[in-house]
């Protein structure tokens, strides 16, 4: 990895040290001349991680018994909600009964989109309007957050309301005030464990406050995307309180709709996605799915179920991923620490899991940092992408994804310098 001298035109730098400025320009130009091609824009598993799941491809062959424990033939139609073997280990992740789990295709994002689309056209709760009939409908978007979440609700013409993130998760004072006083607010996006991009895990208090919400809208829903539920990268992993368990205590089991997938466990694009919700929610969701699909890829479900066995099998497999990812995160964090700590030009997260390191540079410089990195051959997530409508009000947040570049790339981090742009 090389992220070099990326903001080198600051008036401050010129005032303080013309010599240092010239040295940074020279260093940056030197890096540009190396012809780097490093992609750190999205949380894609690297080839070394993909190879960990190669044995999955050998689980099913022409002589394999494709009948489930309950007698379903995975080669045929049927089993709208998925096979029991798969539902069982997803139920452990979600902390729900297997009957409240629906196993889908390869994409949890697809299931989230379908869920919003379904609620747009049919009432979530009897007596409520379909969301498309709600004028000035709104959705809460903790930010910085996941750009593809925001894009779904933007596509359906929701007003996206940013909610500040804290070290404990979304600012619950803001969430409670908005949700409990505005019935046009229909939901909130959440990545509760190792959030994208901050790597924060919601505190116990935050989870409990979510479970205790008293929304003005009866059809308000928490879109709980637990994408990184087993994705630790250190030996001190975070623990996430069970939202559904807390909702049972408060009588709010209809609030959350939960999602996850094996996309960053086995093969992205060829994994298995799942969702879970209360009986009431699942009745609405399944009623819509029955018009949409007969069944998803049960052979892939069977392949995954037999490969892992249960949640313990998943956790053992994730230890292999941790062994690959941990040094990659350390490379990024050590570079930031050694090159930027003393400059006062940036702050960054040090997550225990997930796929990202979030860097906050000086206000008004993130776009320029990303642009200059790209010119130097390092592709980062577009500045602003982690905020609704792609607009970071401070132009300061940059998401770094360490997973995709191999460890044998040149590792000579120099200065990721965040200075103000422009020169008089």
Q: What is each of the regions a protein language model found here?
A:
Residues 10-81, 92, 375-378:
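N-terminal "arm"/small-domain region of PLP-dependent enzymes with the aminotransferase-like
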Residues 319-333, 345-360:
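Conserved glycine-rich beta-strand-loop-beta hairpin in the small C-terminal domain of fold type I
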Residues 104, 245-326:
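Conserved core segment of the aminotransferase class I/II
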Residues 358-364, 380-413:
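Conserved PLP-binding active-site segment of the aspartate aminotransferase-like
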Residues 370-374:
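Short amphipathic alpha-helices in soluble, non-transmembrane regions
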Residues 14-16, 65-66, 72-218, 229-251, ...:
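Conserved core of the PLP fold type I
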Residues 1-9, 14, 415-424:
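Single conserved hydrophobic/aromatic residue that forms the stacking wall/gate
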